[in-house]
């Protein structure tokens, strides 16, 4: 046991140092069993200031109908027209007009911030930035729903820096003023990197994440930061051992909130929010707007405004040309070799589902004479950072990645994405596409798909056709045929029924001679129940998990999957 000093309690404590300084928990962190609820009525809090820009002043400036930048914001009529042109939908009352020009920030944000933005050759704010800035600068909570590569990082970070400028200075032992939660360490590092491009020398930004030694990260927190970017698991670890307090946090950001919930971080996020003062300003950004995110927003935010850039339906970037190659599993490597030859002069990212597949493709690409490296969850953090840094700098390097790199990573000038495996979830499909065609650029996305992959995930195939239609992409004839051959019934995966339409106290439907429940809820002692299924014909496949898994299409000419028997 190592004796360490806590800068917040002033007491000596014991800290169990694990592998690589990671402590006893993995990168997901524990559940914070030792974190106690805060009685905010008995806590002395530093007063916060959330209204950088008065909302009434914004509306008043919007009424001035002149085109000069000094006039401030757009008029109500101009704002409505601008939102229609950029397909922005507003949900909420008293939403301020967008800031369609950097000139609208004059006199509102610190002067250094405008200089930093113009130094990066930005000509105008992106649509999500233009609408989110006035909302956040007026102190309102925000939910932003926008596709990847739309400039969301600066969408919440520019108001955060203006927010810091009007707060009381940090004192020794204070925690951060701004906390940004990200689902993956790669995204957390990217947010930190983008933030450091626009902060001055007297504002400090730090990043803590799992998979890296805790010692340097604890030293960073001990010195003090204004902005902390963190993954939920690692922040829970530090809260659990009382190495950080969040009482000075007045601005909280949940980036890629849908991804955090998909990865099972909801308990950690709830614990962290419980340690942050209730009068905070809360910002959520997400690529989708599922029911879980709606529930989270209603719970964590007050009088919030939701802005949606584009359709609320899941959609792919229209700037990316999508191409599908129908193949068989044994021929995938041959198709990959042809694609690599076709895109030899471009930066290429290859996605696959399995870690062992990524390592195998890395070796195969090197045998073919390509410089290739693989990145996945089994790689150490320093290896992943090295590979990503080299991929950004070297256009000749081919990167093979699992879905750990599918969201949030911003690779400049990535022309081509090749999907070696078809994803199991439609969200992963869209976010793989989002790695190319960023910031208004064009890109190409190629999918190698087999009939077996499409049959295992028939619901994904149906959603895929809808995404292709909304992105104005060509739909292959065979995809339309497969979708038409799908069974007309669907399994209703009700909660409390283990997802297979059975009561928890009832036995599984393993064959036609086991008791089951019918669609109208009647108990059957002889099986053949159709609970969870719509009405079907006499020649339809009886309900069972194996019947659905091995359902065959009329056009399927592949062999039936072999079932191997293993000795017990």
Curated annotation (Swiss-Prot):
Belongs to the DEAD box helicase family. DDX5/DBP2 subfamily. SUPFAM superfamilies: P-loop containing nucleoside triphosphate hydrolases. Disulfide bonds: none annotated. Its EC number is 3.6.4.13. A motif (Q motif) lies at residues 102-130. The gene is HEL64. It is found in: Nucleus. GO terms for molecular function: ATP binding; ATP hydrolysis activity; RNA binding; RNA helicase activity. Residues 335-483 form the Helicase C-terminal domain. Residues 133-307 form the Helicase ATP-binding domain. Pfam families: DEAD, Helicase_C. Keywords: ATP-binding, Helicase, Hydrolase, Nucleotide-binding, Nucleus, RNA-binding. Transmembrane segments: none annotated. A motif (DEAD box) lies at residues 255-258. Residues 1-34 are annotated as: Disordered. It catalyses: ATP + H2O = ADP + phosphate + H(+). It comes from the Eukaryota. The keyword Magnesium does not apply. This is Putative DEAD-box RNA helicase HEL64. One of its GO terms (biological process) is nucleobase-containing compound metabolic process. Residues 23-34 have a biased composition (Basic and acidic residues). InterPro entries: DEAD/DEAH_box_helicase_dom, Helicase_ATP-bd, Helicase_C-like, P-loop_NTPase, RNA-helicase_DEAD-box_CS.
């Amino acid at each position: 046991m190592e004796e360490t000093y806590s800068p917040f309690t002033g007491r000596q404590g014991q800290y169990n140092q694990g592998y690589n300084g990671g402590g006893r928990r993995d990168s997901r962190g524990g559940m914070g069993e030792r974190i106690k609820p805060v009685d905010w009525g008995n806590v002395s809090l530093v007063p916060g200031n959330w209204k950088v820009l008065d909302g009434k002043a914004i509306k008043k400036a919007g009424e001035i109908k002149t085109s000069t930048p000094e006039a401030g914001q757009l008029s109500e009529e101009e704002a409505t027209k601008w939102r229609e042109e950029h397909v922005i939908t507003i949900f909420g009352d008293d939403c301020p007009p967008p800031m369609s020009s950097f000139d609208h920030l004059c006199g509102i944000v610190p002067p250094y911030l405008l200089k930093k933005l113009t130094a990066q050759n930005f000509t105008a704010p992106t649509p999500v930035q233009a609408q989110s800035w006035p909302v956040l600068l007026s102190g309102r909570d925000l939910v932003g729903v926008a596709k990847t590569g739309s400039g969301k990082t600066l969408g919440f970070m520019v108001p955060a820096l203006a927010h810091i400028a009007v707060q009381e200075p940090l004192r020794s032992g204070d925690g951060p003023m701004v906390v940004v939660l990200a689902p993956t360490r790669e995204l957390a590092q990217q947010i930190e990197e983008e933030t450091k491009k626009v902060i001055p020398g007297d504002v400090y930004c730090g990043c803590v994440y799992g998979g890296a030694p805790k010692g340097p990260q604890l030293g960073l927190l001990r010195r003090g930061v204004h902005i902390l970017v963190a993954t939920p698991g690692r922040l829970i670890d530090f809260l659990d051992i009382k190495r950080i307090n969040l009482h000075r946090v007045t601005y909280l950001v949940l980036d890629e909130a849908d991804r955090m919930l998909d990865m099972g971080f909801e308990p950690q996020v709830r614990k962290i929010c419980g340690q942050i003062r209730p009068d905070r300003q809360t910002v959520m950004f997400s690529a989708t707007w599922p029911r879980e995110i709606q529930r989270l927003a209603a719970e964590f935010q007050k009088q919030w405004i939701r802005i949606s850039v584009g359709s609320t339906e899941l959609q792919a970037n229209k700037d990316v040309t999508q191409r599908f190659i129908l193949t068989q599993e044994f021929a995938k490597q041959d198709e990959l070799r042809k694609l690599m030859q076709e895109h030899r002069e471009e930066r290429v990212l290859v996605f696959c589902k399995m870690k062992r597949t990524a390592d195998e493709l890395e070796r195969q690409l090197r045998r073919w004479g390509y410089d290739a490296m693989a990145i996945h969850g089994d790689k150490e953090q320093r290896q992943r950072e090295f590979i990503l840094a080299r991929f950004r700098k070297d256009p000749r390097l081919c990167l093979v990645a699992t879905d750990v790199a599918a969201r949030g990573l911003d690779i400049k000038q990535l022309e081509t994405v090749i999907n070696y495996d078809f994803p199991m979830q439609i969200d992963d499909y869209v976010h793989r596409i989002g790695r190319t065609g960023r910031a208004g650029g064009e890109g190409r996305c190629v999918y190698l798909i087999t009939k077996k992959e499409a049959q295992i995930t028939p619901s994904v195939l149906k959603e895929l056709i809808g995404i292709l239609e909304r992105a104005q992409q060509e739909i292959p004839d065979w995809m339309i045929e497969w979708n038409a051959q799908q069974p007309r019934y669907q399994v209703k995966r009700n909660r409390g029924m283990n997802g297979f339409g059975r009561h928890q106290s009832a036995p599984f439907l393993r064959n036609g001679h086991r008791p089951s429940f019918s669609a109208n809820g009647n108990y059957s002692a002889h099986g053949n129940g159709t609970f969870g299924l719509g009405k079907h014909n006499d020649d339809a496949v009886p309900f069972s998990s194996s019947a659905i898994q091995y359902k065959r299409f009329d056009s399927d000419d592949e062999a039936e999957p072999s079932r191997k028997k293993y000795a017990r």
